[in-house]
UniProtKB/Swiss-Prot annotation:
Gene3D superfamilies in the cross-refs: 3.40.50.1970, Dehydroquinate synthase-like - alpha domain
Top-level taxon of the source organism: Bacteria
Species: Campylobacter lari (strain RM2100 / D67 / ATCC BAA-1060)
Cofactor(s), by name: Co(2+); Zn(2+); NAD(+)
Protein's recorded name: 3-dehydroquinate synthase
Length: 352
C-alpha cells in the first residue's frame, strides 16, 4: 500500500504502508532513535538495513528533550562519525524523533537525505509526513525549525503493536482532527470502530492500515497544494493554537501531543460555538468521539490573560493577528483572524 506525496522541485516521495523490506544503501547511514524504541524494535529494523557503514544515535524519550541542546548532541555525534553530504539519516521513533531527525538532516552540512520510519500512530498519521521539522524552546513549541521533505516514509503496523493505549489514543486525536476539518464521513467510521480493540492494540492490520492510509492521503493532498503552509495547510493546525500553549505551560510533561490537541480541538469548538460557526450538537459529537477514545477534553486555565498573550508567539500569528483554525460545520474548516479579544477571553473563561 503506497501513498504519493506530489511536490515540486523533485522532492516528491512515497509513503509505504506495511511494505518495509530490505533497504540497501551504498553510503553511510545513521539511525536516530530513542532508548525505548531501540529496546523494543531496533533489532527488527537492523535486520532490514544494509549500508556501507551503519551508526546508531540514541536519545532520551520525551517531548521535553526536543530542544537545541539535544540537536547539538546529535550533530556532534554525526560529526564524530564523519558523516558526509551523501550520508543518510533514518528517523526511527515517534513524532519527536521525526521532527528532530528532519531538522538535523536539513542543517547538517546544509542538508542530507533522510527517511522516516515512525513507531507511533501519531507519527504515522501526521508528524512523519509533510516535511515540518523543528524543536521547542522556552517560548513555545516548534518555534525553531525548517520545511524539509523526507526521501521516503515507511509506516509498519508491527511497530504499533507495543504502544500503550495512551499513545494510540494520542494518534487517534490527529485522525479525528482530519475528520473534523476535511471529511465528516470519517467521524461515522470512528463512531462504529471498536475502541477497546483499538486502545488495546488488537485492531486488525487491515483496519489499522486503512486509518493510516486515509489520514496520509488527506495530508498528502493538502501538502501537495501548499507545502510551506501559506494557506490551505494551515487548516491542519486545527486545535493546535490552544494545544501549543497548553504543552508549553505544562513543560511538555503532563500531556502527550495528541492529548493536548484533543483539548485544543474542544477549546476551538467552544470558540466556534460561541461565534455561531458550529452547532451545539456538532460540538457535542466531537466531544463524545474524543471521550470514546479516552482523550482529555478539558484543561484548567489559571490565568486567562496569560494564556491569551501566549497566542502571539504562535507561528500562525501574523502582524499581531491571531489566526484561529475553526470548524465551520463538520468536515470543513476556516481561518479566522478577526475575532475580538473579548470573544477569545470569553471562551477561555469557560476553562478557567
Amino acid at each position: 500500500m503506497q501513498v504519493k506525496v506530489n511536490l515540486e522541485n523533485n522532492t516528491s516521495y512515497n509513503v509505504y504502508i506495511n511494505e518495509l523490506e530490505k533497504l540497501n544503501f551504498d553510503t553511510k547511514v545513521v539511525i536516530l532513535t530513542n532508548e525505548l524504541v531501540a529496546k523494543l524494535h531496533l533489532d527488527t529494523l537492523l535486520e532490514k538495513i544494509q549500508a556501507k557503514e551503519l551508526f546508531i544515535i540514541k536519545i532520551k524519550d520525551g517531548e521535553e528533550y526536543k530542544n537545541l541542546q539535544t540537536i547539538e548532541y546529535i550533530l556532534n555525534q554525526m560529526c564524530a562519525y564523519k558523516l558526509d553530504r551523501k550520508s543518510l539519516l533514518i528517523s526511527f521513533g515517534g513524532g519527536v524523533i521525526s521532527d528532530m531527525g528532519g531538522f538535523v538532516a536539513s542543517i547538517y552540512q546544509r542538508g542530507i537525505e533522510f527517511i522516516n520510519i515512525p513507531t507511533t500512530l501519531l507519527a504515522c498519521v501526521d508528524a512523519s509526513v509533510g516535511g515540518k521539522t523543528g524543536v521547542n524552546n522556552k517560548f513555545g513549541k516548534n518555534l525553531i525549525g525548517t520545511f524539509y521533505q523526507p526521501k521516503a516514509v515507511y509506516c509498519e503496523s508491527r511497530f504499533l503493536k507495543t504502544l500503550p493505549s495512551r499513545e494510540l489514543a494520542a494518534g487517534m486525536a490527529e485522525f479525528i482532527k482530519m475528520a473534523v476539518v476535511f471529511d465528516e464521513t470519517i467521524l461515522s467510521f470512528l463512531e462504529n470502530l471498536n475502541e477497546d480493540k483499538f486502545l488495546n492494540a488488537k485492531l486488525d492490520d487491515i483496519t489499522l492500515a486503512q486509518i493510516i492510509q486515509k489520514s496520509i492521503e488527506l495530508k498528502a493532498s493538502v501538502v501537495s497544494q501548499d507545502e510551506k503552509e501559506s494557506g490551505l495547510r494551515m487548516l491542519l493546525n486545527y486545535g493546535h493554537t490552544f494545544a501549543h500553549v497548553i504543552e508549553n505551560q505544562t513543560g511538555y510533561k503532563k500531556y502527550l501531543h495528541g492529548e493536548a490537541v484533543a483539548i485544543g480541538m474542544n477549546m476551538a469548538n467552544v470558540l466556534a460555538l460561541n461565534l455561531g460557526l458550529l452547532s451545539e450538537q456538532e460540538c457535542q459529537r466531537v466531544q463524545n468521539l474524543l471521550a470514546k477514545f479516552k482523550l482529555p477534553i478539558s484543561y484548567k486555565i489559571s490565568n486567562t490573560h496569560e494564556f491569551y498573550n501566549a497566542f502571539f508567539l504562535d507561528k500562525k500569528t501574523h502582524f499581531q493577528k491571531i489566526n484561529f483554525i475553526l470548524a465551520c460545520g463538520l468536515g470543513k474548516a476556516c481561518i479566522k483572524n478577526d475575532i475580538s479579544k473579548e470573544d477569545i477571553l470569553r471562551t477561555l473563561e469557560v476553562f478557567a
